[in-house]
Amino acid sequence: MRTNFFIFLCFLLNCCSKSGSPAPPAPPPPPPPPVVPVVSWNFETSPVWQDEFDVDGAPDATHWNFEVGGNGWGNNELEYYTNNNNATVQGGTLHITARIENIGSSQYSSARMITKGRGDWLYGRFEIRARIPGGRGTWPAIWLLNSGNVYGGWPKSGEIDIMEHVGFDPNNIHFTVHNQSYYGANGKGSNKIIATAIDSFHVYRCDWTPAGIRGFIDGVQYFEYANPGTGTNAWPYDQPFFMILNVAVGGNWGGAMGVDNSVFPATMDVDYVRVYKWVD
């Protein structure tokens, strides 16, 4: 009898214990799917901003300013960028020239032209017809940076390299985007071999919409970076950007194979820069 009572008591206690146990927590809901805008890739046919470089002399100050200095520019570059001494317009063409010249601790001079405050754009088509220099140690570029660094210093606020070329790899043109998720050697990019890259003019183009960024040479697409819809770490390209034209000397990439002084002066020639508004 006592044994049966004890078994019964244990049964009651077990039931009470089970009935009082909290239910296991529900699994967390799945993350929402990425939100990627569905938009057109249409652009106006007339430029909203352009420079045809049809007036000889200094570059148009209503369109361009200069970044000046010789601090390596975050890439251990060797040149000192001057205030228009290395950039002139002649015969319908802009000439940005890197040359051997001692300025401060730098042994080279060049120019770095920017449109900031004179041309800042959110989305659009950017078209530049240019001929780039070759030779070991040259590093010409056509690129865009965030006008306000809204998300923080590089690479958080983004960079779009419409054209980059390093002289030790003469026929190879690069298009790359950098952001907090992908930057430096891990930037999202593509390259295209152009046999006449340093001998002839080519049209370098970037199409930029809320859905993505595309890169072209002479009308042929060779790069695309789609907006992943995961936030500003991978898509800081929802703010105005400005354009940069420059010819660097040496640096982490441009100088990876050294600098050949026999190639200087080295000039990037620009026939025109045209910006077209994106049509939503």
Can you name each region flagged by the protein language model?
Residues R2, L13-E44:
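Bacterial Sec-dependent N-terminal signal peptides
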Residues P32-D280:
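GH16 jelly-roll
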